[in-house]
Amino acid sequence: MNSPLEAARAAAIHAARAARARYRAGVVEPTAGRAPGMTQANMIALPREWAWDFLLYAQRNPKPCPVLDVIEAGSHATVLAEGADLRTDIPLYRVWRDGRLAGEVSDATALWAGQPDLVTFLIGCSFTFETPLQEAGIEVRHIAQGCNVPMYRTQRMRRPAGRLRGELVVSMRPVPADRVADAVSISGRFPSVHGAPVHVGDPAALGIADLARPDFGDPVEIHPGEVPVFWACGVTPQAAVMASGVPFAVTHAPGHMFITDVPDSTYHV
């Protein structure tokens, strides 16, 4: 007979696999709040000739680009989710050509077929520590509002690597002022999925002019007594694709992550 912990873990894995099956069938939705307790990941796939530059870029910028898995050229499987297909199991993909957004698709199979040497990187995502935040009584506003997390380009440039350069992208969650320390402590125990915030308070210090106009995702309400808290974001690689004019890349659409079979506790330290 399974223990309650084993039963809960099995239910969480089932939820992750069910979510991937929905996305494979064409359902498009932000993944925040889906399969609670399971690790989520950002995705970027680039031609093999750009893979070393990106691996070095991620190594030099681990806060926004914590690598969870690297998938060899041409493969679309990952050890983070047995039987998953990275071409179909993310709800929405972005296609980039010469650093510009060329379109969005819900099935990227044809893109892999047309570019058989794609090397894929899975990058840690802050959605992973949202369940612990909620369990501590800290509301995650975009989940409560049923929308995507707001994300912003900043004026903080990242350390370049090879042909890649670009600015930091951050996600924002409003937190009651008296719970900010708790949010910092909780998220800080998850360094492989961005860890503690990079900034608390005045968005102008990051070069963000208007919180009501995010560059990616949706705006959320900020209630009296709350302060904006900013975390490094796995959309940072997409900013590098844009700034560097990468000839071809496939990424997840912001807020539409790959849900793994790995419990978030795996990345808790």
UniProtKB/Swiss-Prot annotation:
The keyword Lyase applies. SUPFAM superfamilies: PSTPO5379-like (SSF160920). Its EC number is 4.2.1.-. It comes from the Bacteria. InterPro entries: D-Glu_cyclase, Putative_hydro-lyase, UPF0317. Gene3D superfamilies: PSTPO5379-like, PSTPO5379-like domain. GO terms for molecular function: lyase activity. Keywords: Lyase. It holds the Pfam family D-Glu_cyclase. PANTHER family: D-GLUTAMATE CYCLASE, MITOCHONDRIAL (PTHR32022:SF10). Belongs to the D-glutamate cyclase family. This is Putative hydro-lyase Aave_3512.
